A protein has these predicted regions:
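Non-catalytic, topology-defining segments of multipass membrane proteins
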Residues: 1-56, 65, 88, 93-175, ...
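Short, function-defining helix-loop hinge/capping sites that tune catalysis or transport
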Residues: 37, 75-79, 205, 227, ...
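Short acidic-hydrophobic sequence patches enriched in Asp/Glu that either
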Residues: 80-85, 99, 182, 236
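Histidine-centered catalytic micro-motifs
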Residues: 62-71, 97-106, 193-199, 216-232, ...
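Membrane-cytosol interface motif
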Residues: 204-218
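Transmembrane alpha-helical segments that form the membrane-embedded catalytic/substrate-channel core
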Residues: 54-66, 127, 131-136, 177-203, ...
Length: 285
C-alpha cells in the first residue's frame, strides 16, 4: 500500500464513503420485502428457483454490503453508530444475523474439514455445506461472548422474521432464508469465497476477479485492491486498478467464479487445505 500511494498519491482521494451506497442497499432491502407477497403465490419448487436465481443473489449482495458497512463505508468513519444501525437494516432480508466483520482465520477450514472433504465428491459436498461452516466455524475456532450490539441485532432480526411470518407465512421467511443459504453454497456469486484465497497458483495467496458479477456484488472481486486499500469503497476499487495497473495486472486473477467452483471441485491439487495461514502477532496460533 505504501509503495503504491508513494507512486500514485491520487489514490488517497478515493478514500471515504460512497454517498450512493446507502440508497442502493435500501433499494435492495425494499425489493426483497416487496417481493414477499408475490413469492407466497408461487409453488414451493418455483419459489426455490426464484430464491436461487433472484432473492438469494440479492441477499448475498446484501451480505457483501454489510461487509462494506463494517468498514464504515456507508456513512463514513466519523459516524460508526450510523453505520452499525444501517448494517442491522441491511441484514433484515437475510433472515439471520450476519456481522460482516473480518474475523481473523475463522474463515479458514479446520484440519478436520481438510481431511474429510479432499475428494471430488467431498469438495462438492463441502461447497453445499459452506453456509453452515461459515456460520458455526467461528464458534469452534475462536469462540467469544456476543457483544451488546450483536444481541440487539439478533433481537431486531428475530422481530423482523416474526413480522414476516405473521404477514406472509412460512413460505415468505423460507424464501429469504433458503435463498441466502443457497447463494452461499454452489452458486456463481459464492465463487468469491473460493476465488479470493484458495491457492490456484503456487506462491500467490490472494486473487482478484474481474468478471461481470462485480456489477451486482459491490466489486467484491477486486480483492487485492480491497486488501491494499480497505478505506476505498467498492464502487471505486476499479479506479485503484486503473491508476496503478502495474501492481495488479501482472498478478494472476480469475475471470469466472463458476469456473473457480468447477476447478476447485475437479482439480485434485486444490481443496479446503489449499490456503496460506499467516501468524498474527498477539494472537494464539
Amino acid at each position: 500500500m505504501k509503495l503504491i500511494t508513494e507512486k500514485y498519491p491520487q489514490i488517497k482521494k478515493l478514500f471515504g464513503y460512497d454517498p450512493n451506497f446507502k440508497w442502493v442497499v435500501t433499494g435492495m432491502v425494499l425489493v426483497q420485502i416487496i417481493s414477499l407477497p408475490f413469492v407466497t403465490q408461487l409453488s414451493w419448487p418455483m419459489m426455490l428457483v426464484v430464491a436461487y436465481c433472484f432473492g438469494g443473489v440479492i441477499n448475498h449482495s446484501l451480505m457483501l454490503a454489510i461487509h462494506e458497512i463494517a468498514h464504515n463505508l456507508a456513512f463514513g468513519h466519523n459516524r460508526p453508530l450510523a453505520n452499525k444501525l444501517f448494517g442491522f437494516f441491511a441484514n433484515l432480508p437475510i433472515g439471520l444475523p450476519y456481522q460482516g466483520n473480518e474475523v481473523i482465520d475463522t474463515d479458514l477450514p479446520t484440519l478436520l474439514e481438510a481431511k474429510l472433504f479432499c475428494t471430488t465428491g467431498g469438495k462438492l459436498l463441502w461447497l453445499f455445506l459452506q453456509p453452515f461452516f461459515y456460520s458455526f466455524r467461528p464458534l469452534v475456532v475462536r469462540p467469544k461472548p456476543p457483544t451488546p450490539m450483536e444481541l440487539i441485532n439478533l433481537v431486531i432480526q428475530l422481530f423482523f422474521d416474526a413480522v414476516v411470518i405473521k404477514l406472509w407465512g412460512w413460505k415468505a421467511i423460507g424464501y429469504l432464508l433458503i435463498g441466502a443459504l443457497m447463494a452461499m453454497g454452489v452458486h456463481p456469486v459464492a465463487g468469491h469465497f473460493v476465488a479470493e484465497h484458495y491457492m490456484f497458483k503456487k506462491g500467490y495467496e490472494t486473487y482478484s476477479y474481474y468478471g461481470p458479477l462485480n456489477w451486482i456484488t459491490f466489486n467484491v472481486g477486486y480483492h487485492n485492491e480491497h486488501h491494499d486499500f480497505p478505506a476505498v469503497p467498492g464502487s471505486k476499487l476499479p479506479e485503484v486498478r486503473r491508476i496503478a495497473p502495474e501492481f495488479y495486472d501482472t498478478l494472476p486473477h480469475h475471470d469466472s467464479w463458476s469456473k473457480v467452483l468447477y476447478d476447485f471441485v475437479m482439480d485434485p491439487d486444490i481443496g479446503p487445505y489449499a490456503r496460506i495461514k499467516r501468524k498474527h502477532h498477539g494472537l494464539d496460533s
